[in-house]
UniProtKB/Swiss-Prot annotation:
Keywords: Chloroplast, Membrane, NAD, NADP, Plastid, Plastoquinone, Quinone, Thylakoid, Translocase, Transport. Its EC number is 7.1.1.-. GO terms for molecular function: NAD binding; oxidoreductase activity, acting on NAD(P)H, quinone or similar compound as acceptor; quinone binding. It is an enzyme of class 7 (translocase). The lineage of its organism: Eukaryota, Viridiplantae, Streptophyta, Embryophyta, Tracheophyta. The gene is ndhH. SUPFAM superfamilies: HydB/Nqo4-like. NDH shuttles electrons from NAD(P)H:plastoquinone, via FMN and iron-sulfur (Fe-S) centers, to quinones in the photosynthetic chain and possibly in a chloroplast respiratory chain. The immediate electron acceptor for the enzyme in this species is believed to be plastoquinone. Couples the redox reaction to proton translocation, and thus conserves the redox energy in a proton gradient. It is found in: Plastid, Chloroplast thylakoid membrane. This is NAD(P)H-quinone oxidoreductase subunit H, chloroplastic. It comes from Draba nemorosa (Woodland whitlowgrass). It catalyses: a plastoquinone + NADH + (n+1) H(+)(in) = a plastoquinol + NAD(+) + n H(+)(out); a plastoquinone + NADPH + (n+1) H(+)(in) = a plastoquinol + NADP(+) + n H(+)(out). GO terms for cellular component: chloroplast thylakoid membrane. GO terms for biological process: photosynthesis, light reaction.
Amino acid sequence: MKRPVTGKDLMIVNMGPHHPSMHGVLRLIVTLDGEDVVDCEPILGYLHRGMEKIAENRAIIQYLPYVTRWDYLATMFTEAITVNGPEQLGNIQIPKRASYIRVIMLELSRIASHLLWLGPFMADIGAQTPFFYIFREREFVYDLFEAATGMRMMHNFFRIGGIAADLPYGWIDKCLDFCDYFLTEVVEYQKLITRNPIFLERVEGVGIIDGEEAINWGLSGPMLRASGIPWDLRKVDRYESYDEFEWEIQWQKQGDSLARYLVRLSEMTESIKIIQQALEGLPGGPYENLESRGFDRKRNPEWNDFEYRFISKKPSPTFELSKQELYVRVEAPKGELGIFLIGDQSGFPWRWKIRPPGFINLQILPELVKRMKLADIMTILGSIDIIMGEVDR
């Protein structure tokens, strides 16, 4: 029997779009020399839904349910950016109570997002046990969301001028109990994961990005802070009420996958500190600025017509976006989430450009995986933390 000759040519492998470690419908065309990665080409667009064009044909209140489908694991941030832009264009003041509740919801959403990053990331590198512990804690966060907004995901809770509803009776005590419980669980994660020699072997020194490289690639969020750059928009822009709370920016110097893990784990602890301060200092007063519902045009008797009121062929009168442009951003769990908004003195935006953090952070993936092993692709991709809903929009 003649033994087959071993091939020495490069091999091209498709990873995804239907792959359990792709975190959505991402396709990677990987060129391999044995186990070594020679080249990697990401193919995007499988989840493109035209979110920017949809925004140009919707009033802000109509568009709010759409934005929760960008990053569907951290929907409070997409809602926040959607209302912050029109609020700044219209110079609308937010009641202090509404601002505090927004901060609480944003930080709970950050914890939920980081938890749902950590569980699959550990599963990607072969650790199944933490996955189940992490989903247990995430369920408590979703219970809080459901009690306050009526929905576990896709909350549709933020409004121009405030929020949709006040916190229900007993919610604050329930949230404080969760904060005390969760701090003990983070310590358990550190015992279970951080000192594990197999985990350290998979992540330490893998996917290193130095500070200058991170800035040149336009990285943001934990990707940037893990490379030695302590940059956080909550400190820089001081939006909402973040400047009224005491907390520290979490950052690391190593720039590898381990550093990105440590940054996200520490951020969850800082989020708990912010939530506890906001709950203990929660002011009274209204939860929405009702004047933001007004509009400058004189009342038109045509608005009572059948076409307006019942069959909805014409858009109802609503909040107008003034004729100016604005870039507004928030510190989302994955990085800087921003929109470039151009108003046109109408209820619809003239232009709504989304700056998704996952799309920008994903650009460095081909550079990171070159000269690495095939198994390291999952580690590096997982440490970037992407959701294809916001990458493809």
